[in-house]
Every structure is written in structure tokens, then in C-alpha cells.
């Protein structure tokens, strides 16, 4: 699992490097392509070491201590011990859209982030199920590739945004022979596709595995199922408006549901299928599922 994670993370970095070099070549030839190569190396370095901070900053997430969130911290610490993990840091996102995600480069540098809305609508058992799900992502080392993919996809979408403006304003420049405008149009069209490919590197099956892990760590598969239903329903009526859709795969449920651009980044299996699997897990654990 560790080797697979490193290979997939390396592949993502190679894709970004190739994309930036291609853009540089389109706009300025080999010299600009080399400059973009150097920029890509720097970006890859920053992404590996600081992508968790980048993602947390997109949501104004604030790291809290045990004094500020005693019940949440107690749940995280207890379940982390049960999972054989170091206690991750805890962050709270100031939004009423209920959701949660885990980030970081490894279990020793992990953060579990939850929204204010999640703390408001879930009971303790349901919250334990959600935290167990996120801790499983940490234990399975999904967090590095997920966080790196989010940072890279976000950067690529920003490139597409800039390229659209270059294409618009460049078309009014009489000194432009049309080459840069054409290049900008190509970037504007192809960059979102590249972002989707990066998102596709995050397997939807990881959510099923995290659901199972969350159910077993918390010992309450019915509570996780109930939490998923509550979050899904809330997101349908109150999708997240802030943040970056490139991070959708990191959340326990896609928080941008209903926004057209978010569908490009949908990496979650249907919630109904996840709940059905939790029913089977409950039976395996000796419970009679009533959800």
C-alpha cells in the first residue's frame, strides 16, 4: 500500500510537471519550458511539504486544542488510540455545511478537520463514525495523495482561469499574431481535463474502505450510516459555497453537490451504495441493521 501511494503521488507530480512544461513551450518555446520545469520542481516540493496548510487555508480552518473542543478532541484521541495511530491535530472549519476531511503527508503529521455544521447536527455516536472514517484515511495513507491531488488540481484550474483571460484580452491585441491566443485557448480547454485526470487518480473504492474502517474503529456502523444520510441531505439543500471544488474528493461527502463545476471533481460513490455496504458490515459485526 505504501509503494502504491508513492507511485501514484509521483505520477501526479510528473503529470503536473509535463503540463507546465507543455504550457511553457506553447507560449515561449524551449527556454520558457525549462523555466516552467524549474517552477514545477519548486511547486512539487511545496505541495509535498505544505499542501495540508494550503488546503486548510482554503477553508479558513483553525487548529484547536483540547481546551477549545474537549468532546471532539476526546473522540479523536480515543479512536486514534483504538486504531493504533498518533493523535492527529484537530481543526474546525467555520461553515454551517456539515462535512469533514483528513489531510497531511503521513500519520505523524495529520489533521482531522470538521465543520461547525457537522458538530451541530450529529450526535456523539454519529460523530464517532465520521471521525473513524477520517482516521481510516490516515491509517491507509490516503491523505498524502488526496491532499497533493487537491493542491495540484486547484493550481491547474487556476491556470485555466488565467488562460481564459489571456485568450480574451489577447484577441484585442493587434501585435499578437494569434499564436498566444491559440495557446491560451488550448490551455483553457485542456487544463480542466488534466485536473479531472488528477482527480481520477483518487480511487472511489478508498471511500468504501474508509467507511468499513470507520464502522469497525467506532464499533457503530449504524451511526456512520446515519451520519452519511444527514450529511448528504444537508449538502443537497446547503452545498458549500466557499472553498475549492478541487478538494471535493477529500470530504466524506462531496460538499459541492449541485454546483455544475463540482461534478467534474466528483469522486465519491453514491451514498446509497455506501449505506448498503454498511448494512452488510453491521451484519458481519453481529448487529441487526435497522437503517
UniProtKB/Swiss-Prot annotation:
The record's top EC class is hydrolase
Q: Give membrane topology per the record.
A: Multi-pass membrane protein
User: What cofactor does its activity depend on?
Assistant: Zn(2+)
Q: Could you say which EC number(s) this protein's record lists?
A: 3.4.24.-
Q: How is the cofactor bound?
A: Binds 1 zinc ion per subunit.
Catalytic site = 134
Q: Pfam families of this UniProt entry?
A: Peptidase_M48
Q: Where in the cell is it found?
A: Cell membrane
Q: Where does Zn(2+) bind?
A: 133, 137, 207
Kindly state which keywords UniProt assigns to this record, in alphabetical order.
Cell membrane, Hydrolase, Membrane, Metal-binding, Metalloprotease, Protease, Transmembrane, Transmembrane helix, Zinc
Its main localization is: membrane
InterPro entries tied to this protein: HtpX_protease (IPR050083), Pept_M48_protease_HtpX (IPR022919), Peptidase_M48 (IPR001915)
Chain ranges passing through the membrane: 1-21, 23-43, 143-163, 182-202
Query: What sections of the sequence does the record tag as coiled-coil?
Result: none
Q: For this chain's UniProt record, which GO biological process terms are given? A: proteolysis
Q: Which GO terms describe its cellular component?
A: plasma membrane
* GO molecular function ontology, one term from the record: zinc ion binding
So what family is this one in?
Answer: Belongs to the peptidase M48B family.
Q: What is this protein called?
A: Protease HtpX homolog
| Organism name | Thermococcus gammatolerans (strain DSM 15229 / JCM 11827 / EJ3)
- What's the gene? htpX
Amino acid at each position: 500500500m505504501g509503494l502504491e501511494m508513492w507511485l501514484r503521488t509521483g505520477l501526479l507530480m510528473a503529470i503536473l510537471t509535463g503540463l507546465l512544461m507543455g504550457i511553457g513551450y506553447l507560449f515561449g518555446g524551449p527556454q520558457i519550458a525549462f523555466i516552467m520545469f524549474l517552477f514545477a520542481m519548486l511547486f512539487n516540493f511545496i505541495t509535498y511539504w505544505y499542501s495540508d496548510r494550503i488546503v486548510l487555508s482554503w477553508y479558513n480552518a483553525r487548529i484547536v486544542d483540547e481546551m477549545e473542543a474537549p468532546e471532539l478532541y476526546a473522540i479523536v484521541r480515543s479512536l486514534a488510540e483504538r486504531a493504533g495511530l498518533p493523535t492527529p491535530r484537530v481543526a474546525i472549519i467555520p461553515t454551517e455545511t456539515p462535512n469533514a476531511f483528513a489531510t497531511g503527508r503521513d500519520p505523524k503529521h495529520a489533521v482531522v478537520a470538521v465543520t461547525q455544521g457537522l458538530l451541530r447536527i450529529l450526535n456523539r455516536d454519529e460523530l464517532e463514525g465520521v471521525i473513524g472514517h477520517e482516521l481510516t484515511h490516515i491509517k491507509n495513507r490516503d491523505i498524502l495523495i488526496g491532499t497533493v491531488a487537491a493542491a495540484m488540481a486547484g493550481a491547474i484550474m487556476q491556470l485555466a482561469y488565467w488562460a481564459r483571460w489571456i485568450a480574451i484580452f489577447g484577441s484585442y491585441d493587434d501585435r499578437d499574431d494569434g499564436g498566444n491566443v491559440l495557446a491560451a485557448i488550448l490551455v483553457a480547454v485542456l487544463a480542466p481535463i488534466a485536473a479531472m485526470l488528477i482527480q481520477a487518480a483518487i480511487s472511489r473504492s478508498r471511500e468504501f474502505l474508509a467507511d468499513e474502517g470507520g464502522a469497525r474503529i467506532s464499533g457503530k456502523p449504524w451511526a456512520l450510516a446515519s451520519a452519511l444520510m444527514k450529511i448528504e441531505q444537508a449538502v443537497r439543500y446547503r452545498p458549500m459555497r466557499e472553498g475549492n471544488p478541487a478538494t471535493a474528493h477529500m470530504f466524506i461527502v462531496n460538499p459541492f453537490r449541485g454546483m455544475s463545476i463540482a461534478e467534474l471533481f466528483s469522486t465519491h460513490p453514491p451514498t446509497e451504495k455506501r449505506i448498503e455496504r454498511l448494512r452488510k458490515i453491521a451484519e458481519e459485526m453481529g448487529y441487526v441493521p435497522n437503517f
